[in-house]
Amino acid sequence: MKKFIPVLVMMLFATIALFAGCASKTPTPASNDPVFGNGGLSVIKGDYIYYVNGYESNETTKSSHANKEGQVEVSSIYVAKIQNGELSDKKQLVSKVGGFEYSDLYIFGDKLYFLTPNTRKDDTGEIRSDIITLCSINLDGSKLSEIFTPTQYSSGAFSMKEVDGKVYAFVFDGTTLSQIELDNKNKVTQVSADVTSFATSRDKTCYSENARKSLDSSLDRFLFYSRSRNEQEGKNEGVGGNILEKYDIVTGEKTILSSNINTTTKVTNVEGGRLFYTKGDSYYSMDSSFSNELRHTYVTVDGFTPLGKGEGGEELGIIIKYNSKFYLQKLTDSVIPAVAFSEDNLDIIAVDQDLIIVKDSNSKILSISSKDKSTVTLFEPADEQTLGDKFDFDGRYLVLLESVTDYNSNYSYIVDTFGAAGGQTSATQIGTVVDSDKK
């Protein structure tokens, strides 16, 4: 009997610990549930949406204590169940800054990956919060981990994708391009130094379900970047121009695509199975053969957005912004059409096949079809509301940042655009306001 009592006590404590552990974890989608909208302010997996609660200004994130785990509220990352744009069971997933200048949420497997301002001190004892740190956390809210922090992040760029069943992250810090193998103990490879621009195709999970049907994956295994010449390429002899290079993510092989003397090349997009770049002020592109170069412009333009391919694999063309007007130009043309696609001064915030999501001068958000110019209003801010400059669109849900009356920060809102054709859209606030943020 004396032996039996300690056993009962041990079983009781084990049971309590088990249920306590279960209670602390967040409900999660099934491992095989599909992911939509990777990259940006939000991402959906199954019936759950993961999103930034609000936005922190750059000045706020520079505070030495602004990003301590457990103390972040306004810009932290939340999770909720989502059904037809309605959210329930909202819960803070991680108390770290997720809503800031470089917001980027991705889900691969059962982990959420996100960027957050750096919290570590450098050699001088200063916390360089202007540098990002790539972190991960399990979807149940456990095991927050820091993965990679570059030494700088000036005019940087970040992307994630799955290639041949393995997940990679790519960080361009303004000078150096690095690759992180997340399935290989977060192994970091420096792809190239002296990089001046970088692009890669987006992972299929960044696109809507409809757009995935016509994706061209021929360039998915490559990174493309421009870099300065090295000593062997005439750097010390004053040879002008730079190098356009591709990098095979799987094999590590590098191939020079262009090294024109006195020509400066800048990579801009990888879309629809084509690499887009500029030489001087003109836009060009190449397909996956890398042998046929198309020139798209002869004049300096204000904006250049490739639309990729339609449902049948047809080329949808390019939206060019010129003299504050939109022009829809065929991929094979190099002269801007005589007639404008839109006379309005618009800014593109997202593209989903033939749908172009734009913001007008009054902060109204519209979708325009490149096929027939049909236009639908997706969102119109209320009087005295201020719209942020970050947006996220996954083909259905539009997530944006907007001011809330009597509060200092912008908080997240969601619009279910599937009701737009019937004029039924409205923005629902999903960000949870914080008392300490009151004016």
For each predicted feature, which ranges?
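Repeated scaffold domains used in trafficking and secretory/extracellular systems
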Residues: V35-V43, G99-G109, Q152-D164, D194-S217, ...
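Non-cytosolic head/periplasmic domains of membrane-anchored proteins
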Residues: F114-P117, I132-L139, K143-K161, Y168-V171
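Residue position within the beta-strands of beta-propeller blades
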Residues: Y50-V52, Y113-T116, A169-V171, Y207, ...
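C-terminal motif of bacterial Sec signal peptides marking the signal peptidase cleavage site
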Residues: L18-G21
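Beta-strand-rich domains and repeat architectures in extracellular enzymes and scaffolds
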Residues: T28-I77, K96-D104
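Positively charged n-region of N-terminal signal peptides that target proteins for export
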Residues: M1-I5
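Surface-exposed loop/turn elements that mediate protein-protein interactions on large endomembrane-trafficking
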Residues: A23-S31, K62-S95, G125-T149, G174-S197, ...
